[in-house]
Amino acid sequence: MTETADPLNRPLKRGWTTGSCATAAARAAYELLMTGSCPAIVDIALPGGRRASFAVAIHEAEGGRATAGVVKDAGDDPDVTHGALIKATVQRRDAGSGIAFRAGSGVGTVTRPGLPLPPGEPAINPVPREMIIAAIDEAATALGGTRDVTVEIAIPGGEDLAKKTLNPRLGIVGGLSILGTTGIVVPFSCAAWIHSIYRGIDVARAAGLPHIAGATGSTSEKAVQQLYGLPDTALIDMGDFAGGMLKYLRRHPVGRVTVAGGFAKMTKLGQGLLDLHSRAGEVDLGWLATALHDAGAPPELVETARTANTALQVLQESDRSGFPAGDVVARAAWQTAYRALANDAVALDVAVFDRDGRLVGRCLGADHSPLPRNRR
């Protein structure tokens, strides 16, 4: 599978989701359990009707249980699960009991409400479950076997890999999630990140948290958490997707949301950009110069903004002059965010930080006056 060239003008290889790999492993393990022989290649149906083939990396059978494993290939996507072994163990259940799922080693368990699965369930998402059930049904029809089985999914090393994901924050403990809605990983896709934003908001809402914060990066996230004393569950890894977060909150509101980010990213938001990635637009220093001029900034600061190469230069001159450029940016960013949110039931504020996590600007609402300038 290949994908049209994206950042490097070369074909990017697509990959397979953990859900697809778990389905293939479950199909192979089921065949091994029913026939005593494991296929080298298994073929499964993907959501949408396509089919895909997977090589079986390992298999074993003993004591009425059969296990098979598939190595995940994420293609060119920077996925922490790339190269992981996804294992499925299948064993018979009582007649008429249907298919049950278990979390094996390295697969997490849901502990908080707000996710697509209730607390206590293995973190095998609904679409992968449907895929596995369909694969078992297909194999059972072909082989004349039972549909009453337990399917346990395991990922060796998954508990350590999960520390690099949002699972701990979402209340998924013990390992990774089995994910996927299409069965296919698209390299550098925005969809997975935006989906994680939605899940973070859902968990915060289910927990009844009155205040959440979406941050553009780790520095601003740590800073806004310290500023407001927020629990980890209240922190949304917004990244560049300010618009995605705010539009979701429009339909799924919380009591209060803080949008937090660095000076340059919040300048982009102030300009009117809701996608803060460089591909969507650069910092418009001409816009910033005009905004500072209109706010009564000293001529030296305005001229710096007009001639600067980076937003950092403007922030440094703001420090020297004592004029709160960060507050000007925060106010403009608040206006953009307010229009995107479009829900007065949600209190909105913006916090702007420098690269050291120092608060350099803030807007608590439409009528908020600039703060006195913080100095080192």
UniProtKB/Swiss-Prot annotation:
It catalyses: Co-precorrin-5B + S-adenosyl-L-methionine = Co-precorrin-6A + S-adenosyl-L-homocysteine. GO terms for biological process: anaerobic cobalamin biosynthetic process; methylation. It comes from the Bacteria. SUPFAM superfamilies: CbiD-like (SSF111342). Keywords: Cobalamin biosynthesis, Methyltransferase, S-adenosyl-L-methionine, Transferase. Gene3D superfamilies: CbiD-like. GO terms for molecular function: cobalt-precorrin-5B C1-methyltransferase activity. It is an enzyme of class 2 (transferase). Its EC number is 2.1.1.195. The keyword Transferase applies. InterPro entries: CbiD, CbiD_sf. Pathway: Cofactor biosynthesis; adenosylcobalamin biosynthesis; cob(II)yrinate a,c-diamide from sirohydrochlorin (anaerobic route): step 6/10. The keyword Cytoplasm does not apply. Belongs to the CbiD family. This is Cobalt-precorrin-5B C(1)-methyltransferase. It comes from Bradyrhizobium sp. (strain BTAi1 / ATCC BAA-1182). The gene is cbiD.
